[in-house]
UniProtKB/Swiss-Prot annotation:
Its EC number is 2.3.1.117. Pathway: Amino-acid biosynthesis; L-lysine biosynthesis via DAP pathway; LL-2,6-diaminopimelate from (S)-tetrahydrodipicolinate (succinylase route): step 1/3. Inhibited by p-(chloromercuri)benzenesulfonic acid and cobalt. It comes from Unknown prokaryotic organism. The keyword Repeat applies. GO terms for biological process: diaminopimelate biosynthetic process; lysine biosynthetic process via diaminopimelate. One of its GO terms (cellular component) is cytoplasm. This is 2,3,4,5-tetrahydropyridine-2,6-dicarboxylate N-succinyltransferase. PROSITE patterns: HEXAPEP_TRANSFERASES. Gene3D superfamilies: Hexapeptide repeat proteins, Tetrahydrodipicolinate-N-succinyltransferase, N-terminal domain. The gene is dapD. It is found in: Cytoplasm. Keywords: Acyltransferase, Amino-acid biosynthesis, Cytoplasm, Diaminopimelate biosynthesis, Lysine biosynthesis, Repeat, Transferase. Homotrimer. Its main location: cytoplasm.
Length: 274
């Protein structure tokens, strides 16, 4: 694996000079191998190690290199034709392979090659970009978008129209991460490498970026870039120091544990916020 990483790192340093016409065989094979490993879930752009999320920047570099080494080409779809550098993940799937891998794909859901989809996942008409990782038992609902290299945990529900941001550039940015057993409400946006920790519930229409203040009304603490585990979050506003205006924030209205989540439905958690 170190040899593969070395090839990617070296090629990335000279990426401006690489084209589909002049790319060498070693680089092309290395990039294609990485994309295949991401596609199968054998590698992932970020993983939790000793309780901390670690981003493997060289894998993101491989994804970016894939755009340098491939020409656009025509791709046939059910409703129309496409012209792009990245093939569709399911282009060569037959019924036997779909059954073996054990997930459902509802037309016209789109998944790019290099994204991993785990067993018991349901993809409604949605979009999953290259480098993303969608773990077991997750629902990606209608018109939801999972951005490049985003990491989605087990038993997550991404409701209709949810946007999970991609972060291929800038390269130093960490991917957006939704941990296990989270619920993201309709039309919410989680971007810029924000981490929504395990068991959190995000209400409809909540927008979370690195500069969004995430206010815990019980403690008065303000978080940036991270929703603590077990948080129930709604949209809100915080006043300016002089009280002359207010600005958008997200508000943690309560904390719940796994036992409470098991007994109480998501809708009930969001309705009883007082």
């Amino acid at each position: 694996m170190q040899q593969l990483q070395n090839v990617i790192e070296s090629a990335f340093e000279r990426r401006a000079d690489i084209t589909p016409a002049n790319v060498d065989t070693v680089t092309r094979e290395a990039v294609n191998q990485v994309i295949g490993l991401l596609d199968s879930g054998a590698l992932r752009v970020a993983e939790k190690i000793d309780g901390q999320w670690v981003t493997h920047q060289w894998l993101k570099k491989a994804v970016l290199l894939s755009f340098r080494i491939n020409d656009n080409k025509v791709m046939d779809g059910a409703e129309t034709r496409y012209y792009d550098k990245v093939p569709m993940k399911f282009a060569d799937y037959d019924e036997a392979r779909f059954q073996k891998e054990g997930f459902r794909v509802v037309p016209p859901a789109t998944v790019r090659q290099g994204a991993f989809i785990a067993r018991n996942t349901v993809l409604m008409p949605s979009y999953v970009n290259i480098g993303a990782y969608v773990d077991e038992g997750t629902m990606v609902d209608t018109w939801a978008t999972v951005g490049s290299c985003a990491q989605i945990g087990k038993n997550v529900h991404l409701s209709g129209g949810v946007g999970i941001g991609g972060v291929l550039e800038p390269l130093q940015a960490n991917p957006t991460i939704i941990e296990d057993n989270c619920f993201i409400g309709a039309r919410s946006e989680v971007v810029e490498g924000v981490i929504v920790e395990e068991g959190s519930v995000i209400s409809m229409g909540v927008y979370l970026g690195q500069s969004t203040r995430i206010y815990d009304r019980e403690t008065g603490e303000i978080h940036y870039g991270r929703v603590p585990a077990g948080s129930v979050v709604v949209s809100g506003n915080l006043p300016s120091k002089d009280g002359s205006y207010s600005l958008y924030c997200a508000v943690i209205v309560k904390k719940v544990d796994a036992k409470t989540r098991g007994k109480v439905g998501i809708n009930e958690l969001l309705r009883t916020i007082d």
